[in-house]
A protein has these predicted regions:
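Small-residue (G/A/S/T)-rich helix-start motifs and N-terminal tracts that mark the onset
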Residues: 1-78
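Conserved beta-alpha-beta core of the PfkB/ribokinase-like small-molecule kinase fold
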Residues: 78-81, 85-112
Length: 112
């Protein structure tokens, strides 16, 4: 008996150290819905479960490199974008996704 292949969802967003939001919450949600998550962090947030006091963006070139590696290896079924930490990351994400218009995209902006 063969196992069903789980759809692979690329989650792009911030790292919430409490797991209540960001890519940690995306991983949990995607798994509960039967998918497999692969992730690209856009920022490390400075927070606890009561407050966010700041964030540090991930360098755009690192985001781009990680994205290319994941898109080359995995058959991405959909992409979810959450927190985009700065303009440079927004441009890197746009360049990364431009060659893949066939992949469904969900945008859930956190900071605008």
């Amino acid at each position: 008996m063969s196992r069903a292949v789980r759809p692979i969802i690329l989650a792009i967003g911030g790292h919430d150290p409490t797991g209540g939001a960001g890519i940690q919450a995306d991983i949990e949600t995607i798994g509960q819905l039967g998918g497999q998550a692969v992730t690209i962090p856009t920022a490390i947030t400075l927070q606890n479960s009561h407050q966010v006091v700041g964030f540090e963006p991930v360098a755009a070139h690192l985001l781009s490199q990680q994205g290319r590696m994941l898109l080359e290896e995995f058959p991405i079924a959909a992409i979810k974008i959450g927190m985009v930490a700065n303009v440079e990351n927004c441009e890197a994400i746009q360049a990364l996704l431009r060659p893949h218009p066939e992949i469904p995209l969900l945008i859930d902006p956190v900071l605008a």
